[in-house]
UniProtKB/Swiss-Prot annotation:
Record NCBIfam families: small_GTP (TIGR00231)
Taxonomic lineage: Eukaryota, Metazoa, Chordata, Craniata, Vertebrata
EC number: 3.6.5.2
Protein name as catalogued: Ras-related C3 botulinum toxin substrate 2
Entry's family note: Belongs to the small GTPase superfamily. Rho family.
GO molecular function: GTP binding; GTPase activity; protein kinase regulator activity
Residues bearing the modification N6-acetyllysine: K147
Cellular localisation: Cytoplasm; Membrane
Amino acid sequence: MQAIKCVVVGDGAVGKTCLLISYTTNAFPGEYIPTVFDNYSANVMVDSKPVNLGLWDTAGQEDYDRLRPLSYPQTDVFLICFSLVSPASYENVRAKWFPEVRHHCPSTPIILVGTKLDLRDDKDTIEKLKEKKLAPITYPQGLALAKDIDSVKYLECSALTQRGLKTVFDEAIRAVLCPQPTRQQKRPCSLL
């Protein structure tokens, strides 16, 4: 059985841990708990192929900037996450996460993931953003960013409702099993 290492990165509180817990346990966790990182392992079938999917959670907080890259070697695919209701986390994909991942892993495939899809149409959330002269991130904005960072795919999901959740991980596996030729041939990350 092929083993695939998938590392999840993004700003603190965008829902990385909830994404992983909801996917692996089919249950949405309670309160927000910042993570250093937890590893999950799941045997899954994608396109009739059995895969051992190793899921690596990371801490988005700046305190962990020096520690986080220790989980990057031998990564097969990255999920760079941002919250659809946090424009700052969206901007940080370009400003921080993409450069960090590419610095350590120049040719590992990336999937861009917009989280908290259930809140994009939530009246209270929209109102809070409007008070700060902000708005939720739209699907076309997500697609444009994915193109800018040469992401294999752009996907949106909700860990709460599980809408689009399984697709995120299926596509992460497909990005490794059926690599798309890009400007550079993709290969697992290694630190020299």
